[in-house]
């Protein structure tokens, strides 16, 4: 499917996406974290990787599409899917195939079909860095996410697109050095849906500041980080943990080859609040739960459109009450995503952000 052909605000388009997500998914009957290496020719050994191996796929949860059936009786079928991050040569990762659509042959005997849960379904849009929750043919909520971001040391962190099903609840995911992602749910080998990461203070306090600032842009090592702050419908990662059934379909839209979306800015008249006695944040709630009670209620003497004034230039958004990020941050994220997919930032978009 071409994501650019769908308008997520259109109820008919939502129903069409839901119908697609309710279709059975073909997966491979190996362990949830085991690898399958489709080869360019039927029955070939996967080594040497560069010559024989099309990529690395995962069992139980990752959907594959059968392109050619076993017509000659050799027991192999040609499949297509998005390669994962771990495909390794004898010496180095095959980063050129990370998150790329690949084709190769696998044994027909390992393929089986799964009917997804019809309670909910999830759509992750890598271009917009949003997760959309579907129920009964309609979107019932959306959440901010961070998908995988390649870097110089790890040029294989991109979150593969494609279709998946949830297969197990992992719980707390330890990213190392006391950094935790709660409520982790496995959807593709080592790729998890989990709450936005937090560091842990000596007294056990969870510190989300660094990672919540990255929501809405690529930042992870491949997992899908999801907001912890509940949206207007009361949904967040914990809600997903509590409500998703096993075998929930997860559709991930790629960003490559897409048209850039029209960026949205918060209303300039949005009322904001602050602590004029030294607070460093701006807030959307006069009684923000992240502020000590002795400073409440906060002072509401400016709006989102006033953030460029000298008096408010140094204020940063409060993650506890979900204050929107500054316009310059939104623009930086937009430019970053445009560069990721080779798209041009138009003069109209620049004008919208006041960029000359």
Feature map (PLM): residue ranges:
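Exported/periplasmic cell-wall-interacting domains
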Residues: 8, 86, 157, 161, ...
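SH3-family beta-barrel domains
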Residues: 1-45, 57, 263-279, 344-346
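Acidic Ser/Thr/Pro-rich low-complexity disordered segments
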Residues: 25-28, 84-100, 201-204, 288, ...
């Amino acid at each position: 499917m071409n994501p650019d052909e769908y308008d997520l605000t259109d109820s008919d388009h939502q129903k069409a996406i839901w119908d697609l997500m309710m279709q059975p998914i073909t997966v491979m009957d190996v362990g949830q974290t085991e690898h399958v290496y489709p080869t360019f020719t039927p029955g070939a050994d996967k080594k040497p990787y560069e010559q024989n191996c099309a990529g690395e796929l995962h069992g139980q949860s990752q959907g594959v599409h059968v392109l050619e059936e076993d017509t000659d009786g050799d027991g192999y079928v040609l499949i297509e899917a998005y390669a994962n991050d771990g495909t390794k040569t004898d010496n180095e990762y095959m980063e050129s195939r990370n998150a790329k659509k690949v084709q190769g042959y696998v044994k027909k005997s390992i393929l089986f079909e799964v009917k997804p849960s019809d309670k909910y379904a999830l759509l992750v849009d890598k271009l917009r860095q949003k997760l959309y929750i579907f129920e009964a043919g309609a979107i019932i909520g959306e959440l901010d996410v961070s998908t995988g971001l390649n870097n110089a040391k790890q040029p294989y962190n991109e979150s593969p697109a494609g279709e998946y099903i949830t297969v197990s609840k992992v719980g707390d995911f330890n990213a190392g050095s006391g950094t935790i992602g709660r409520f982790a749910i496995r959807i593709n080998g080592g790729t998890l849906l989990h709450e936005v990461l937090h560091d842990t203070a000596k007294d056990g306090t969870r510190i989300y500041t660094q990672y919540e600032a990255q929501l809405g842009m690529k930042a992870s090592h491949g997992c899908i980080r999801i907001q912890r702050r509940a949206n207007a419908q009361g949904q967040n990662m914990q809600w997903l943990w509590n409500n998703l059934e096993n075998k929930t379909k997860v559709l991930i839209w790629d960003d490559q080859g897409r048209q850039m979306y029209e960026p949205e800015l918060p209303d300039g008249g949005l009322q904001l609040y602050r602590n004029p006695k030294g607070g460093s944040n701006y807030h959307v709630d006069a009684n923000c739960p992240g502020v000590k009670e002795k400073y409440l209620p906060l002072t509401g003497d400016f709006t989102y459109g006033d953030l460029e004034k000298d008096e408010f230039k140094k204020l940063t958004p409060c993650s506890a009450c979900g204050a929107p990020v500054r316009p310059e941050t939104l623009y930086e994220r937009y430019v970053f995503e445009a560069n990721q997919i080779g798209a041009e930032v138009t003069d109209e978009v620049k004008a919208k952000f006041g960029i000359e």
